[in-house]
A protein has these predicted regions:
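C-terminal and inter-domain tail/linker signature
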Residues: 1-217
Length: 217
């Protein structure tokens, strides 16, 4: 019998600060607000799910994630427009539902559709963190249950803060690590919704931005 060895929880402290009427960081590109539950209304269930369905959900999530290792932002002479076009026509497109929703943490916000996801998070992120390693640390936690899957790691990404595109802070060229979780809803054969807790305050602290000190001012 397996026993729990560790437990990690990400509380969106920045969203708590936002709801209290303070905003200590740059404006989000996406829409801020409370995350909705799954469109299928079945996020919590106490029934045993079909094992084959769970395996298929996990495989789809992992295959999509592996496709993200294709990095057009590192192509010689790549421009903002070039990378954006490549991401909109990236192999990831095969796995996302046409009506996908991406729910990011406070500081990034929510995005609708692949175009919104690319414009509000993926493109700025990739332009800022061109030097990154998903696999050195990795999303080593992999769980699936029916039409849901999740991956995570503590930490799960190591990268170099190389531009101001993501979150809007001047590049520091510092190496940072990220605490990230990905929760997926698989619907109509594709990934329909993606909830992504990220410890933004922890990332900002590594590049010299203390959000908790800022709210005191």
């Amino acid at each position: 019998m397996y026993k729990r060895q560790q437990s990690h929880i990400l509380i969106d402290t920045l969203d708590f600060i936002r709801q209290a009427g303070f905003w200590p960081i740059n404006k989000s590109l996406g829409v801020e607000g409370m995350w909705p539950g799954p469109i299928t209304g079945d996020g919590t269930t106490f029934e045993n799910m079909d094992d084959e369905l769970s395996i298929n959900s996990m495989n789809q999530a992992l295959t999509m994630q592996r496709s993200l290792n294709i990095k057009p932002e590192t192509d010689p002479g790549s421009t903002h427009e070039y990378v954006r076009d490549k991401l909109l026509n990236h192999p990831q497109k095969e796995y996302w539902h046409p009506k996908m929703m991406w729910y990011g943490p406070c500081g990034i916000g929510t995005a609708r559709g692949l175009e919104g996801f690319v414009d509000h998070h993926q493109l700025p992120f990739r332009l800022t963190f061109k030097e990154r390693d998903y696999w050195k640390i990795g999303h080593y936690i992999e769980i699936a249950d029916g039409n849901y899957s999740m991956t995570s790691g503590w930490h799960s990404i190591e990268c170099i803060h190389g531009s101001s595109e993501w979150l809007g802070y001047e590049p520091t060229n510092k190496s940072v690590t990220m605490r990230v979780m990905d929760f997926y809803l698989h619907h109509e054969g594709l990934i329909r919704e993606n909830w992504v807790p990220i410890d933004i305050a922890h990332i900002l602290n590594q590049i010299g931005i203390d959000v908790f000190d800022l709210i005191k001012k």
